[in-house]
Amino acid sequence: MEKMVVKDSDEKDRYSLEEIKNKVILGDALKVLKKIDEEIFDMVFIDPPYFLQLSNKKLKRWNVNTVVEGVNDEWDKFQSFEEYDDFIRKLLTEVKRVMKPSGTIWVIGTYHNIFRIGKIMQDLGYWILNDVIWVKTNPMPNWLGVRFTNATETLIWAVKDKDVKDYTFNREYARRFGIGKIGANVWVLPLCQGSERLKDENGKKLHSTQKPIELLKRVILTSTKEGDLILDPMAGTGTTGYVAKALRRDFVMIEINERYIEGMVERFKKPLRITDKPVPKLEKISKYLGLEGLK
């Protein structure tokens, strides 16, 4: 496709950093990670499958006769919790191997999967530093009218083990992005929307769970330095690398879906201009929600 894409193959048994730096590898994350050298990444961001366990039944909104659209992609389908847990365990085991001793990892999820992932991380020896709650200002309503609207996602931030002390934490950015004067672990920002959302040839969203630029900006600025190397083994539409490049960090991404990579390549042709300040309108939203008073 393009020079930024490396196609994995069974014949390839090892990747040097020079081969994959600032590139996306087209391949299976579990296979590709085994071919990467140990202890080279300063930070890892993972947006794994949610395992929503949606039924094939078309659910109708309670107040209008239209169908609810959710995440129903093949990559989100597993046969059981055991299969899902095994996949996550293997992924996190390989990721831990390629993290620097001082590296940190972020994993994002919803109530469907984040608690299982947190337990697996602790079982593997990771030491959780924080959870960060992303409050969505434009969440999908609970159209079925049977439960609360799910307006949050949780990010787990961790190091390789409890003895790690020299990880990067940029406190001023944390205070700037978190709510209240102390910069609490709550980030208020919208879902990916408008021109930021990548579309397919039919004008439909290319990826059902594309993460917003603002979210990755906050992750990267609070936990890395310029020149650091960032890994995203489930890159989707490439937001992690896209933001990393704009913030003068290096990256390696892995993605198995060729359509996502095609969209990613087109995206990278348009350089991202980004500021390290919170988006002003988001600050207004925080005040509207009554969150600015947190001490």
Please identify what each model-predicted range represents.
Residues 253-254, 273-278, 285:
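Asp-based, Mg2+/Mn2+-dependent phosphohydrolase catalytic module
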Residues 50-51, 192, 273, 280-282:
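Intrinsically disordered, low-complexity segments enriched in proline/serine/threonine
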Residues 1-263, 295:
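Core catalytic lobe of class I
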Residues 261, 265-276:
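C-terminal helical cap(s) of enzyme catalytic domains, especially alpha/beta-barrels
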Residues 289-295:
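Radical SAM enzyme core and accessory elements
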Residues 27-31, 281-289:
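Conserved SAM/SAH-binding loop
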